[in-house]
Amino acid sequence: MKHMIQPFGIDMYTKVLTDTKSSKHMSFYEADKSGMPDNFTISFIPSYTTEWIICYNDDNDKAEFICAGSQNKLTELSLNVFDHYFGVRFDNTGCYFNKGCNSKTYPVNIADNVFRYEPATDSYEMQLIKDFHKSLTFKDRVALFKAFATDCKTFCPVSESIKKLNSLIYSGAGTVSELSAESGYSVRHISRLYNKVYGIGAKDFIKMYRFQNVLAEIIANPDRDNSFFIEGTGYSDQAHFQREFKTFTGTTPKQYIKLIKNF
């Protein structure tokens, strides 16, 4: 069984605890081995956000940190067997990097990459694992991770120009031409800005944003007809929506809805 991990689907698996409210720029989720099938594989739906998954055991210091940058295509990842999996989904306002990094280090630096490593004995990451061992609740671990990110990493925000452009997209700009007209930037300059920060063009960013919003509606209202989901979203017709859905998820809307209903 494959489970989709993306901003609006992190709570699709019945055994997963989630927290999307306590932090402005992060969503948290947690699952343990008892709720997972063997040979567990997760699929990252194309997105402009980054993901960390911390895998650890109860009775030893064996652990693995997984950092997945923004993905331009559907990406599958097999998880090694651990007692617990603690995940963090960051939004598109920036990334956390190691202390001392250049403040203009953007998400593009890890785009389309998945980094996996075991924490060194005296590292900040190993101390976080030890703190997780002593924690009692999911809420405790969320607080511990937030402190870890603040104290041991550097948050590098996206540029002010990108913040402005993203805000226009959130407000309804559905094409690069509309974005250009509303921002005063040329189409070419906008594309350069998005590629510099995210490693994707503005057109692809808008596609991802549109699709994630539609996916949120599907998860919230799986019994609705497809026409309800795509109304006013920029899809030209059902065929356009079906093609993009297949590209992003590797499946059809009908199959996807059946999948989430079975969770």
Predicted region positions:
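Alpha-helical bundle regulatory/interaction domains
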Residues: 1-163, 168-177, 183-187, 201, ...
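Long, low-complexity intrinsically disordered regions
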Residues: 176, 191-196, 203-206
